[in-house]
Amino acid sequence: MDPETCPCPTGGSCTCEDSCKCQGCKCTSCKKSCCSCCPAECEKCAKDCVCKGGEGAEAEKCSCCQ
């Protein structure tokens, strides 16, 4: 599966675990770690977040959660 897209439409339902690296998740059920760089406590993760910044997940910052 393409790591930069989500397998469901806007408002759809999907399973998004810690291994999910989609950058534009629109799933209402996807609330945690949708961005590879998004912190687990972030509640805005399902709203079109993208990872920006340096190389590697530790150097990147989530556009929604920073």
Curated annotation (Swiss-Prot):
Molecular function GO labels: cadmium ion binding; copper ion binding; metal ion sequestering activity; protein kinase activator activity; zinc ion binding
Briefly state the protein's biological role: Binds heavy metals. Contains five zinc and one copper atoms per polypeptide chain and only a negligible amount of cadmium.
* Superkingdom of source: Eukaryota
Q: Which UniProt keywords apply?
A: Acetylation, Copper, Metal-binding, Metal-thiolate cluster, Phosphoprotein, Zinc
Q: Does the keyword Cell membrane apply?
A: no
Question: Which region ranges are annotated with the description Beta?
Answer: 1-30
What the entry lists under Pfam families is as follows: Metallothio
Organism listed in the record: Oryctolagus cuniculus (Rabbit)
Binding-site positions, a divalent metal cation 1:
6, 8, 22, 25
Give yes or no: UniProt keyword Metal-binding.
yes
Q: Where is the PTM N-acetylmethionine found along the chain? A: 1
Q: Which residues bind a divalent metal cation 4?
A: 34-35, 45, 49
Annotated GO biological processes are: activation of protein kinase B activity; cellular detoxification; cellular response to cadmium ion; cellular response to copper ion; cellular response to reactive oxygen species; cellular response to zinc ion; detoxification of copper ion; energy reserve metabolic process
- Supply the PANTHER family for this chain: METALLOTHIONEIN, METALLOTHIONEIN-3
Residue sites binding a divalent metal cation 6 per the record: 38, 42, 45, 65
Give residue numbers for the modification (Phosphoserine): 33
> What protein name is recorded for this chain?
Metallothionein-3
Q: Name one GO cellular component term.
A: inclusion body
Identify its protein family.
Belongs to the metallothionein superfamily. Type 1 family.
Residues where a divalent metal cation 7 binds? 51, 62, 64-65
List residues binding a divalent metal cation 3: 16, 20, 25, 30
- In this chain, the stretch annotated as Alpha covers 31-66
Tell me the residue numbers annotated for binding a divalent metal cation 2.
8, 14, 16, 27
Q: Which InterPro entries does the UniProt entry name for this protein?
A: Metalthion_dom_sf, Metalthion_dom_sf_vert, Metalthion_vert
Annotated residues for binding of a divalent metal cation 5:
35, 37-38, 51
